[in-house]
């Protein structure tokens, strides 16, 4: 992967150098100019859909004055994404770059070292959240990762990257985005702050609906026949969970022991539903159901927003609309 990124960076730098040679030698005079003084659109690059949608919400009508890019717009999820030379170039001269900051974004550091815009603002979601970021948890019954099976110790803890699935985290992160947009584009500072405040109220309202749903539910445990990227969500509302794999797992095949454990948990807890995430083939979930006593549990899907397409965005999908749909699924799952 590192060799791949190095080749990309060399390619990008050659292209940028050729491009620079054809420009007038005036760039040094505008290094400290604000975006509006340069008369150009604000360039914002995001990696994943939630970041992209948050910028849109904060920008409001000013989105017409932005060149906003979502890199992961073709269904590739965060854990398997590899940037193209075009992606690296977009990052290189943007005004604001927003990324998650976990292990899946290991390529970012090298990309930023070669950035043309030295005044670029960068938001690392995990850094913004600080010590509230959670380590990935291998819970009872989960399929162990290869490193753990071989007895190798990891050099450092692996953090759960799916921080956007907490509405409480979303409030913190949108505030950080708004603050940086205000510094980049002071002319529209009041608009950004007003939009961020209004969006924060929507997040608060939905957060309370989630808590109310959990408080009223008789069932407090979710069981995933799939990867589990919803750690932040369940922790926010005091829910318990079981799952086949951790959130960042690359595994797709569950062992007999894992399926047996999860099937027995369904029976033990009297669960009526087994959950998967978007794009799942549901094979593991179906096998779990087939091995329960009743064999009649529903298979539900929660959307982790890791595979949101540009077409979904064009058709009106937003962060809030996905979280609202997830709430409806949660209501059914907790029956």
Question: Residue locations for each model-derived region?
Answer:
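Bacterial Sec-dependent N-terminal signal peptides
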Residues: 2-4
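Extracytoplasmic metal-acquisition and chelation regions
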Residues: 6-9, 21-335
């Amino acid at each position: 992967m590192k060799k791949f990124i190095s080749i990309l960076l060399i390619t990008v730098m050659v292209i940028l150098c050729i491009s620079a040679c054809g420009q007038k030698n005036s760039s040094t005079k505008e290094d400290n100019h604000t975006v509006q003084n340069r008369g150009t659109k604000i360039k914002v690059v995001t990696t994943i859909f939630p970041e992209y949608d948050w910028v849109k919400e904060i920008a409001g009508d000013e989105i017409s004055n932005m060149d906003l890019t979502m890199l992961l717009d073709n269904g590739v999820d965060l854990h398997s994404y590899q940037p193209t030379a075009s992606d690296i170039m977009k990052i290189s001269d943007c005004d604001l770059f927003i990324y998650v900051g976990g292990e899946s974004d290991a390529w970012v550091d090298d990309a930023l070292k070669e950035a043309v815009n030295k005044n670029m603002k960068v938001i690392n979601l995990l850094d913004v959240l600080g010590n509230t970021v959670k380590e990935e948890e291998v819970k009872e019954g989960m399929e162990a990762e290869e490193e753990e099976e071989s007895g190798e110790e990891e050099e450092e803890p692996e953090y759960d990257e799916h921080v956007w699935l907490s509405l409480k985290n979303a409030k913190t992160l949108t505030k950080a985005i708004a603050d940086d947009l205000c510094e980049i584009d002071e002319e529209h500072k009041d608009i950004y702050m007003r939009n961020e405040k209004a969006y924060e109220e929507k997040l608060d309202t939905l957060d309370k609906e989630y808590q109310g749903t959990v408080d009223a539910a008789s069932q407090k445990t979710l069981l995933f026949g799939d990867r589990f990227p919803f750690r932040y969500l369940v922790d926010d509302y005091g829910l318990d969970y079981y799952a086949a794999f951790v959130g960042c797992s690359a595994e797709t095949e569950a062992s007999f022991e894992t399926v047996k454990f999860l099937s027995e948990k369904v029976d033990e807890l009297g669960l009526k539903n087994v959950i998967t995430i978007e794009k799942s083939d549901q094979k593991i979930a179906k096998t779990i159901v087939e091995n329960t006593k009743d064999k009649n549990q529903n298979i539900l899907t929660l959307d982790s927003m890791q595979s949101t397409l540009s077409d979904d965005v064009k058709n009106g999908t937003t962060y809030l609309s996905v979280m609202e749909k997830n709430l409806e699924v949660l209501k059914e799952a907790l029956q």
